[in-house]
Amino acid sequence: MTHCFIRALLRQPVERTPVWMMRQAGRYLPEYREVRERAGSFMNLCTSPELACEVTLQPLERYRLDAAILFSDILTVPDAMGLGLEFVEGEGPRFRNPIRGAADIHRLGVPDPEAELAYVPAAVRLIKQRLGDRAPLIGFSGSPWTLATYMVEGGSSREFRKVKCLMYEEPALMHELLEKLADAVALYLNAQIAAGVDAVMVFDTWGGNLDTEHYLAFSLRYAERVRQQLRLTGRGRIPAIFFTKGGGQWLEAMADAGYDALGLDWTTDIGSARQRVGDRVALQGNLDPVALYARPEIIRGEVRKILERYGRGSGHVFNLGHGVTPDIKPEHVGAMIEAVHEFSPAFHRT
């Protein structure tokens, strides 16, 4: 029987609401920190199929999760395009060769996932071998817009001055960059699908920093271009999830982009979101990650509220509204997951 995570994404009947977490394999887990130290660097961890497999499976050994998500980083794609990714302690990701003009964009090529990114499909194959039928595996990529923000800014940014200036002053150049990125992302996700992932997710972390006109033209347009190129049939139906952090105001437009499910951050009421999108897409989310700092009984209450707001029936995957933070207590994560298991069956009884 198809796993409840896949059925929920396809809005098919389920016996309970499935649950997983963005960044579920991460620094809040002591076992992850041990492997990270053994790896020597974050990039070593990402590029070693054996280590990536180990940390991908860690949260499933600890919790009753309904999906594993490939351990990797969204910036592996621009790294394979020649930008030279490095992670600086206390500073985050940084590119040695950021985009600084038209010539940099013109010379960008679309990387071959089985060559420049071969460690990713290799990790997928290894994870699937060891995961077996325990849970589906999610593959992922950053969205074209989100990848472009890092590539033009040279790393993380709060104001996005450089990338927005390029968008306003040289829109044709920005479109050229985003077209290449959309094709690269689609190729990358298709390689993950061919290697065995059961679902894919596109993370548009920074789309919510745009106004409506520019979100539709420079973010959602290229997420849709990615979706149009995805090969989602073959080994059964492969659901695709799209998540724009801060994108609640554009749900109706996002629901028309062709994805099976939309991720919600915690600023959008999931009940009203369900009314707005109707039966076009499933919804994923959307507990505030900061709620996990609260006492377990508070966490349980917040879980119940979200389940009640969504209401009865399938089409909901429980998740956080963004990634789990590094200093969360693992037992608080467990309280959230167990609350979903305990409370959600009541919303699926006929």
Swiss-Prot record:
The keyword Secreted does not apply. It catalyses: uroporphyrinogen III + 4 H(+) = coproporphyrinogen III + 4 CO2. It is an enzyme of class 4 (lyase). Keywords: Cytoplasm, Decarboxylase, Lyase, Porphyrin biosynthesis. It comes from Methylococcus capsulatus (strain ATCC 33009 / NCIMB 11132 / Bath). Catalyzes the decarboxylation of four acetate groups of uroporphyrinogen-III to yield coproporphyrinogen-III. GO terms for molecular function: uroporphyrinogen decarboxylase activity. It is found in: Cytoplasm. CDD domains: URO-D (cd00717). It holds the Pfam family URO-D. The record marks 73 as: Transition state stabilizer. This is Uroporphyrinogen decarboxylase. Pathway: Porphyrin-containing compound metabolism; protoporphyrin-IX biosynthesis; coproporphyrinogen-III from 5-aminolevulinate: step 4/4. One of its GO terms (cellular component) is cytosol. Belongs to the uroporphyrinogen decarboxylase family. Its main location: cytoplasm. Substrate binds at residues 23-27, 73, 150, 205, 322. SUPFAM superfamilies: UROD/MetE-like (SSF51726). One of its GO terms (biological process) is protoporphyrinogen IX biosynthetic process from glutamate.
